[in-house]
Amino acid sequence: MALVVVPDPDALLLIRRAERPGDPWSGQMGLPGGRSSPADAGLLETAIRETREEVGISLLREELVGQLDDVAPRSPHLPPLMVRPFLFVLSRRPIVIPNSEVAEHLWVDWVSLVHPESYRPHTIRLGETVREFPAYHVSPIPVWGMTERILAPLVELLAAD
């Protein structure tokens, strides 16, 4: 998984996943990234390859700032997997060329993410159950779930500045 950050203004790339039958994250906001391939040398290579495939951005190792904590789904209804997010800071905003897995993309400025009013519950109906999840309301579709959990520590650090 790649967090792609650009300056002027400081912004983060978010994608909305395409609607696909059987995909539990279908239609949700997220970050570029996906399954590792046997050809990948490691999860960093997976993040670089998947970002290139999904949004047409060729990330360079020199743009890698660091690795965030691994995140896994908390629901027993989701596939057992582990996501390792890598933070890349680019010198300028690249052209985004989404593939068929990406319905749309947007650049969200950090000011919006750290604004206290953007972080509030998102209500989801799961069958007969209604649940609330923490979410960033910075796009037409709230950013919640694993993506929210990836972003939260970073947003906390930025808000502390």
How does the language model describe each region?
Residues M1-L31:
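N-terminal strand-loop-strand
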Residues A2-V5, T147, L151-L154:
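Buried hydrophobic packing segments
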Residues P21, R35-S139, V143, A152-D161:
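Unchanged
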Residues M29-S36, T147:
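Gly/Ser/Thr-rich beta-alpha loop segments that engage phosphate groups in nucleotides
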